[in-house]
């Protein structure tokens, strides 16, 4: 394989909802380019893209698959992205390292929620978009209705390049209004027959051609002037105008294919090779210092690792994009994230499970290598003339959580090691060994996401594991002031233990002034604040600790021990054992003994005094509340709202966005437990949602009572 220059390389992501035909399209592209001799199929489990055992088991893409084709003296690096929202990380990763998105639309359904999600991501990243209506041979395909929906959602920027003469099982021909030709195929597919447009289609074709010419001309002043003069452009001028329109996202070309029979795929590839932007046509990327980095093969060497794959008999396969310079086997590079040195071994052009050895990859190119010592997903490796880091991939928050444990407790360490290793393949799920919840928590993008994780643990790592309901990280706080005192005294011969602490607790809110006095039972207690310590609690909220002891009742040297005793208590609230937060404590009196007082005595006295005061101060349980955004077709809005109201959600607003309804709400984390499953069931998989932590709020009294009872029952069971 020859070495391609930067201006000969195009990087393309195949996006679309699950079932829209991305993997089938990838197979047809490889076939048309002569990379494979026979097209595989998802049903036969023999495609180039879906080759991991878990993908073959479930019949869905789980990981993005990188491959390349050589087409008309150009190299097209193509990434086949998973369509399920559960594996959105693969699509996000791919969009960040490619320069062109091809979004497939299922001809049976038209634009779906996955279409919308992918388009939103391209919008955030400013990536060019081509729409591709697939499965035109389906008897459910209504092409005109699909185009109408697309124009309603995406506006006049959607410009048809092609339209089919017939849809359904009889589909075998289309009109291309860029080339002004008719393309047709034999029933089994194969090479197209290219003919003149039939007379009865000429009016429609000319109308669409004129729209396309105008859209292309709008992206260049010179082309616009010519269009005004002659109302026409040459084919090359149209290509140039469309290329500029793609870069600025002012035009979204619409193509037609039947990927299963390879009808229209060759024409699509010609367009990708001849029209879509090269790597160096796109805006420059920025490093973490905000500096623009051009894809210059003569520049300093810098390589960004965007994906790690774990393959049997090989181990880690590290996928990278050359950001600047060129990379060759034997190059000595420095890991900008970890400080370690790496020598690059053999480098490859990617071809799914296969690889093609190459002698060099230039700026903008994508490849992979194996057997690196200390490189993780997201790391940057630099040559001696570069000191750059790239960190531009931002993943969505997890939406579905489960506690996981090994059936055999002896496998716990092995389980954690396997989880940490597997996370290199997919950064969109998180593993946490929670001290607070006393569980190992895995958080992912949905039930299917974690189900495939479990399958891989059991089948690849030979670990027998179970999922459980994760505990909720409740918090405890107080709602009124209270005071308490406690004397710790212990005498058993020799030096004893003595410490007495008098303290007041009250709710704390940001910006509260320090108190000057308190009144209890008609008695006023004056406060003379001698020291103040504000603790930002690692679990959220604050503890404010004030020393108001006068007259030397307690030496200042014992105050750290008193604070430690209080902090120990705040780690185990009295209601449910949850962390406590947002409390102000004022130590105002106490006693000490000249011989028996020590730090332990005051720590224990403070612990008891604080616990007693907390229980008297109107203790309440707080629950985590999340911001929720649901994208749902209007037909399902009523059902979704009813379901949310049954989950104690507070509806904050509704809006229309790209043909869908966007519903905003605040909802307790407890009620999100199986929301992804319920939403999919309610909408037939046509809705999606995002979540983000918002705040902690008081739980209703009836729920507080149940939580306390459950905690007491758990303690009783542990004591048996």
Which residues make up each language-model segment?
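Structural and coupling elements of P-loop NTPases
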Residues: 1-720
């Amino acid at each position: 394989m020859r070495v391609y220059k930067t201006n000969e390389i195009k990087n393309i992501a195949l996006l679309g909802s699950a079932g829209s035909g991305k993997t089938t399209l990838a197979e047809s592209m490889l076939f048309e380019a002569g990379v494979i001799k026979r097209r595989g199929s998802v049903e036969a489990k023999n495609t180039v893209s879906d080759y991991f055992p878990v993908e073959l088991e479930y019949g869905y893409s789980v990981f993005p698959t990188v491959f390349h084709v050589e087409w008309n003296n150009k190299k097209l690096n193509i990434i086949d992205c998973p369509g399920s929202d559960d594996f959105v990380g693969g699509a996000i990763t791919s969009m960040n390292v490619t320069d062109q998105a091809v979004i497939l639309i299922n001809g049976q359904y038209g634009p779906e929620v996955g279409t919308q999600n992918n388009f939103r991501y391209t919008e955030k990243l400013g990536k060019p978009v081509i729409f591709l209506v697939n499965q035109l041979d389906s008897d459910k395909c209504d092409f005109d209705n699909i185009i109408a929906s697309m124009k309603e959602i995406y506006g006049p920027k959607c410009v048809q390049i092609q339209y089919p003469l017939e849809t359904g099982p009889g589909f075998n021909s289309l009109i291309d209004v860029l080339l002004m030709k008719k393309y047709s195929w034999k029933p089994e597919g194969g090479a197209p027959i290219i003919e003149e447009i039939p007379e009865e289609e000429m009016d429609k074709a000319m109308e669409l051609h004129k729209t396309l010419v105008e859209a292309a001309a709008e992206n260049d002043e010179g082309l616009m002037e010519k269009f005004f003069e002659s109302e026409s452009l040459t084919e090359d001028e149209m290509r140039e105008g469309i290329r500029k329109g793609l870069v600025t996202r002012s035009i979204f070309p619409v193509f037609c294919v039947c990927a299963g029979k390879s009808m229209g795929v060759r024409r699509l590839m010609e367009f990708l090779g001849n029209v879509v932007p090269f790597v160096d046509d796109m805006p420059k990327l920025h490093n973490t210092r905000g500096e623009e980095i051009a894809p210059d093969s003569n520049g300093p060497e810098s390589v960004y690792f965007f994906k790690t794959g774990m393959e049997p008999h090989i181990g880690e396969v590290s996928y990278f994009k050359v950001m600047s310079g060129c990379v060759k086997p034997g190059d000595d590079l420095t890991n900008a994230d970890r400080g370690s040195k790496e020598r690059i071994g053999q480098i490859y052009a990617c071809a799914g499970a296969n690889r093609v050895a190459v002698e060099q990859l230039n700026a903008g190119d994508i490849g992979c290598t194996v057997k690196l010592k200390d490189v993780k997903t997201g790391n940057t490796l630099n040559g001696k003339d570069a000191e750059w880091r790239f960190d531009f991939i931002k993943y969505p928050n997890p939406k579905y959580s489960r506690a996981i444990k090994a059936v055999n407790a002896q496998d716990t360490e092995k389980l954690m090691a396997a989880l940490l290793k597997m996370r290199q393949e997919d950064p969109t799920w998180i593993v946490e060994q929670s001290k607070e919840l006393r569980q190992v928590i895995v958080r992912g993008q949905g039930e299917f996401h974690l189900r495939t994780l479990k399958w891989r643990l059991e089948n690849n790592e030979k670990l027998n594991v179970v999922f459980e309901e994760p505990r909720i990280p409740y918090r405890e706080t107080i709602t009124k002031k209270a005071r308490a005192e406690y004397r710790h005294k212990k005498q058993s011969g020799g030096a004893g233990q003595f410490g007495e602490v008098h303290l007041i607790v009250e709710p704390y809110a940001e910006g509260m002034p320090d108190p000057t006095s308190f009144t209890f039972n008609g008695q006023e207690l004056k406060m003379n604040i001698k020291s103040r310590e504000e603790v930002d609690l690692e679990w959220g909220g604050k503890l404010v600790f004030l020393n108001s002891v006068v007259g030397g009742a307690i030496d200042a040297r014992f105050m750290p021990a008193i604070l430690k005793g209080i902090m120990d208590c705040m780690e185990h609230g009295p209601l449910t054992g949850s962390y406590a937060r947002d409390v102000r404590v004022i130590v105002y009196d106490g006693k000490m003994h000249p011989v028996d007082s020590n730090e332990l005595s005051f720590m224990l006295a403070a612990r008891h005094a604080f616990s007693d005061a907390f229980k008297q101060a109107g203790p309440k349980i707080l629950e985590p509340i999340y911001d929720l955004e649901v994208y749902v077709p209007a037909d399902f809005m009523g059902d979704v709202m009813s379901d949310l109201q049954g989950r104690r959600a507070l509806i904050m607003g509704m809006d229309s966005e790209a043909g869908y309804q966007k519903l905003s709400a605040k909802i307790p984390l407890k009620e999100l437990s199986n929301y992804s499953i319920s939403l999919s069931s309610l909408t037939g998989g046509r809705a999606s949602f995002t979540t983000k932590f918002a705040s902690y709020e008081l739980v209703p009294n009836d729920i507080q009572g149940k939580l306390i009872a459950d905690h007491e029952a758990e303690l009783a069971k542990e004591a048996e």
